[in-house]
Amino acid sequence: MLSKLLRLGEGRMLKRLKRVADYVNTLSDEVEKLTDAELRAKTDEFKKRHADGESLDDLLPEAFAVAREAAWRVLDQRPFDVQVMGAAALHFGNVAEMKTGEGKTLTSVLPAYLNGIGGKGVHVVTVNDYLAKRDSEWMGRVHRFLGLDVGVILAQMTPDERRVAYNADITYGTNNEFGFDYLRDNMAHSLDDLVQRGHNFAIVDEVDSILIDEARTPLIISGPADGASNWYLEFARLAPLMEKDVHYEVDLRKRTVGVHELGVEFVEDQLGIDNLYEAANSPLVSYLNNALKAKELFHRDKDYIVRDGEVLIVDEFTGRVLYGRRYNEGMHQAIEAKEHVEIKAENQTLATITLQNYFRLYDKLSGMTGTAQTEAAELHEIYKLGVVPIPTNKPMIRTDQSDLIYKTEEAKYIAVVDDVVERYQKGQPVLIGTTSVERSEYLSRQFQKRRIPHNVLNAKYHEQEAGIVAVAGRRGGVTVATHMAGRGTDIVLGGNVDFLTDQRLRERGLDPVETPDEYEAAWHEELPKVKAEAAAEAKEVIEAGGLYVLGTERHESRRIDNQLRGRSGRQGDPGESRFYLSLGDELMRRFNGAALEAMLNRLNLPDDVPIEAKMVTRAIKSAQTQVEQQNFEVRKNVLKYDEVMNQQRKVIYAERRRILEGENLKEQALEMVRDVVTAYVNGATAEGYAEDWDLDALWTALKTLYPVGIDYATLTRRDADGGFDDLTREELLEALLKDAERAYATREAELEEIAGEGAMRQLERNVLLNVIDRKWREHLYEMDYLKEGIGLRAMAQRDPLVEYQREGYDMFMAMLDGMKEESVGFLFNVTVEAVPAPQVAPVQTPEGLAELGAPAEQGGTATAARDEAPTQLRAKGIDNEAPAMTYSGPSEDGSAQVQRNGGDAKTPAGVPAGASRRERRAAARQQGRGAKPPKSVKRR
């Protein structure tokens, strides 16, 4: 119902976009007459008009006409009217649903150019580094032709290179890099370390993949914790010895494991411990669960691969390797132990944000995808984004065949290979979609046996992705690929002309960034030749039936299936698609597989005879809908809990930024001193009369905070009975506040003698930043610990979310109080020394980056500007080096979790590992006390 309501305004929006495209068309003749220099000068004209008060909406028709003409002159590609409509939808802050092959990348050039004129920056977000680099070079040619700077953010870049890229008018990069840079900026200790300059406008390519599929994936920057435990190896040894459905059970749908009583007894006997669930042994439960999950739920060459002794996660939606990403909650270490590779240290969360909350930082957000209607409700509810389906440039004539279902996987793959061989023999290109690296390599071996030339595209061959996809539409091409979702290169019948042309030019040593002039000249010379060759081959492919897409398994998301199908039939080309299924497929096993198997058994069909039935289609659709609803609920739940952290994060990050930007912090520091002293006094004088106050304890506490300069005896008068006379709490507080302010002034004078004027301001900044960071890290740990167990509140008929909000708020306020107290203590008591300021070396910027956005007069060298400081303060215990950081990914359910350390288990002294439970209990009773932890656990 919500989806229907959201689509009510589609007709009006399409009419509005059509009027925009028509208006842009009326300007075409005028723009075509302009010389290259005059076309480029339009950018300066638009910037001036915008600065004089003209809105970007007012400039839209002219700017789009100029960008459209520039694309034609530079790329030999003129955006169609439907692409202009899509571009307008993006500018107005919508998701443009454009089918595969309709030119989404070219469409993004127009709104990026228009919003780049505003000078506040445009972020074009892609799904991987390759596409970010490719688009910044390819589409960047248009922007540079028109006089705009273009930058690209890549994983290996230094902070100085990133700063140059962010200062460009248009910046390309991945969602992870943008998000991690935001987190790093909010961990910086100097303005010079900041790289981003705000969140103005984002265009998200494959928006459903990034904002929906990866929304369960919080971005986490972690630092090393206390160290890894040998328990991972011990439980990796035990897990294979335990039997499924005897020692434990597995729920594939929820992706959980549950240990039976027999399993608990088995582990206790193996480890030589008395009770797995007593407090001292409770960390072992997590090791056990992770070892069983690694055994049953995480499969090599599907969920991860092992390369060069390292476990690398494979994205379940795109099939790409997620370099640098690790499972949390000890899951990655459990998999490393299972695969017998080096177990890397566990991590502590330093900073985290969900992609949902990161992208909601942008003033304006838009996106492109070929499949958004199925997620329109979620995009509207979470991001306030409308979905506008853009008409195709030519009618779609692809034939989508009904699914074929086989009883066994073996029979299914035999049929797949036979079908592909038949298509290959008549010259029809085939794209086979698989769900795992293992399956793609199995099919590859079958094709080798049948001597069918083919390409394999999976996580192991990620680097060759663009080249493989670009030639997948050539005559007789056979391509085996895992999860075609998000593959940014078009499959064009006869071959991708742009890619093939670029490939030939690069073979000649030409590059669009390094040698732009020679590249442009050679491009226009080579392009017609490649076009002619590709057109002749495309004609043969069309006669053979166009691209045939063959899916070997249904994905849990209908969108992924639709994206795979959408690779065929682009721009009015003929094409065909079909899915081959079996009862052994994961989706069928998780949902409704038993009913289908019973039906096939009743029909008594041979294994190699498939069925086509509406029941199959309904069962698959029902299963996919259930999974999508589950995933939506998970994402909504993640967002609800992260919203609590998000409000707290905003407060902390705003405070850090204020400190970094150089505001005089003296008054804030003095206010902290007053607050802490007041809290101490209130605590000591809360109850009773003056004679009941424990001023000795108060003075002892205050002396640990700052050098108290007065004795309370001088503030009081004793009466005949020895009690205090006429001393009020207000008088006591006033005297102590004056004394604390005096002590602060004395401290400031001492520091200025050591390091000159402004030394106290420098110490205030260092102390506040370090205390904020340390307390925030501790708070993240505590909040994750709270979230981990908050679900149990439901057993007491309490709403876990409400409890999390309430306790999270109390913990946050307690953290702020602790922050004040710790800061005041450091300001008064930390030992400092003056050291020479470090010399600033010029930062060398690669020539390519200078082209992509560095000012011309820099000549390829950028020098970070810093205030001159002859000396700096070094505070012991404060100016510590930042810990080594890692950038980790999701746990298996996508929720944000922190890895924590466990302790060692306890065993009764003198009882060998492997003794029976009765023997261990008897030994414990004889000792009459708790057991001591052994130095190690012996194996049987």
From Swiss-Prot:
| Claim: Cell membrane is one of the keywords in the record | yes
The answer, when asked if Transport is one of the entry's keywords, is: yes
Listed binding positions for ATP are Q83, G101, E102, G103, K104, T105, D490
Q: Where in the cell is it found?
A: Cell membrane; Cytoplasm
**What's an example of a GO molecular-function annotation for this chain?**
ATP binding
- What are the recorded Gene Ontology BP terms? intracellular protein transmembrane transport; protein import; protein targeting; protein transport by the Sec complex
Main localization is membrane
Q: Which SUPFAM superfamilies match?
A: Helical scaffold and wing domains of SecA, P-loop containing nucleoside triphosphate hydrolases, Pre-protein crosslinking domain of SecA
Which major enzyme category is it? translocase
Which pairs of Cys residues are joined through disulfide bonds in the record? none
Q: Give me the reactions it catalyses.
A: ATP + H2O + cellular proteinSide 1 = ADP + phosphate + cellular proteinSide 2
- As recorded in UniProt, its EC number(s) are 7.4.2.8
Disordered: annotated span: 856-940
Instruction: Cite the PROSITE patterns for this sequence.
Output: SECA_MOTOR_DEAD
PANTHER family associated with the record: CHLOROPLAST PROTEIN-TRANSPORTING ATPASE (PTHR30612:SF0), SECA INNER MEMBRANE COMPONENT OF SEC PROTEIN SECRETION SYSTEM (PTHR30612)
Name the record gives this protein: Protein translocase subunit SecA 1
- Give the source lineage, highest ranks first: Bacteria, Bacillati, Actinomycetota, Actinomycetes, Mycobacteriales
